[in-house]
Amino acid sequence: MDKSKRPFLKFKRSFRRRLPPIQSGDRIDYRNMSLISRFISEQGKILSRRVNRLTLKQQRLITLAIKQARILSLLPFLNNEKQFERTESTARTTGFKARNK
């Protein structure tokens, strides 16, 4: 094969496999808040399986644990601290408007 006709080969970077987010000793349970809180966004939403890098079974168990913790009031359904601060600061300070008749 001639050098000019050879396909361009990319340089291969070294690849290090990331550690799984859930170790074998971790219990997926609604009471295990340190584990559950890793899989919730800042807004209080459950992160997707692709973001979490979990297996299908692990994601299903995490989702059930989060929902159970929400029902038992261990976790909020929504985390709207930023929205609450905004509505508090934009509250009207003026009195009632005078109506024109």
UniProtKB/Swiss-Prot annotation:
Taxonomic superkingdom: Eukaryota
SS bonds (residue pairs): none
Protein name (record): Small ribosomal subunit protein bS18c
Gene field: rps18
Any Pfam family the entry gives: Ribosomal_S18
Species per Swiss-Prot/TrEMBL record: Nicotiana tabacum
The protein's assembly and partners: Part of the 30S ribosomal subunit.
GO cellular component terms, A-Z: chloroplast; ribonucleoprotein complex; ribosome
Keywords carried by this UniProt record: Chloroplast, Plastid, Ribonucleoprotein, Ribosomal protein, RNA-binding, rRNA-binding
NCBIfam families in the record: S18
One biological process term in Gene Ontology: translation
InterPro entries, alphabetized: Ribosomal_bS18 (IPR001648), Ribosomal_bS18_CS (IPR018275), Ribosomal_bS18_sf (IPR036870)
Keyword RNA-binding: yes
Primary location class: plastid
Key word Chloroplast present: yes
MF term (GO), any: structural constituent of ribosome
Subcellular location: Plastid, Chloroplast
Family per record: Belongs to the bacterial ribosomal protein bS18 family.
